[in-house]
Amino acid sequence: MLILQGGGSLGAFACGVFKALAKRSIRVDIIAGTSIGGVNAAILAGSKDAKHPEHLLEQFWLELSESFVDFDKVTFPSASMPKVIEHLLLPYTNFYNYFPTPTSKHEEHYSRANDNGGDELTIRMKQLRSFYSSAFFGNDKMFKPRWIQETALTDPEYFTPTKWTYMYDHLPLVKTLEKYIDYDKLQPNGNPNARLILTAVNILTAEPLTFDSSKQQITSKHILATSAYPLYNFRWIEVEDGVYAWDGGLLSNTPLREVLDVSPVNDKRIFLVENYPKRVNALPKNLPEVYHRARDIIFSDKTEHSVTMSKVITLYLRYIEELYQLIESNMDLTKVDPKQLKRIRKKYKKYKQERGAEIKDIFYITRDEPFPHMYENADFSPETIKNSIKEGEMKTIQALKGQIRSM
């Protein structure tokens, strides 16, 4: 199975991971994801190219990168325009108030904050500009800002931003995905490329929502729900009457537990893609890096307890099975109450069915962060997306080195 974390533009890393798995003919029977991981998972599971879903996933990411608007190349109708849009982003920039804005002196700021050389400064500046490009102009293949002029006639709250509950509309993603996903596959008996599991959260109850292609029809609405992250100002989605959903990353950015719950019988070999590293080698050097590391910890993999409990349950089941076989083989069953024996057999089969899966292997494939930056998950620039795909491929090859087997 393949587990894909959320992480905005960092999701391109997972594209490279799957490319490497495909090149080695490693098949996955379950693909689970949340946020952009859910988008990736849906493309792979429902890909119109059944033989090479990795090709369409890469095309998707390249299409997003081609729609990137370079902030430095835009001519504003008014010199004050960047300041106006910047004001709209105050809820975000106030939360991370140590970061520069597009109208502040970037170089001076980072010269004070870091003394690690020009290369790092150049990369950080590029990440910052890429973030503001996405924040100001959106990406017309994935999401659009609510303040753009074309929405003035259709949005009844356009001129009353104090009533806004979101700042970005990701409905453009629906049209983009139509080129890549055959939704007829994403339903029971739909013959998907893999079973698809997406996660979200019920806004009104805080309860987890799990969308499973083996049990229901997965639609674009479910993909929008799993990628509706409110702290990045995306809109909520009504997935069914009265059920309003946000991004599953609010509960867990690594939907392993959900997969173990819905697929409890078959043994598991797991490929877990980490967009946000659990472990780093050094402490943060300044406030931006403090915020970045805190963000990484919030979104990082927290499934160790789930893995441990799964292994404990496996040990218990083996012990129960030994006792059960001992009873069946050595006891005079004519002396046992038939009803009691039936109850024991029923419970044994139930426990084995509900929690019989064993985790055989977990391959952690983790993205590197040579220059930590809060804005890295909003960098959709072509160079960054292509580099992320290459890195995912390379890191997967390293993770599999000497461990490739038939799966």
Predicted features by range, described:
Residues 1-34, 43-407:
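Patatin-like phospholipase
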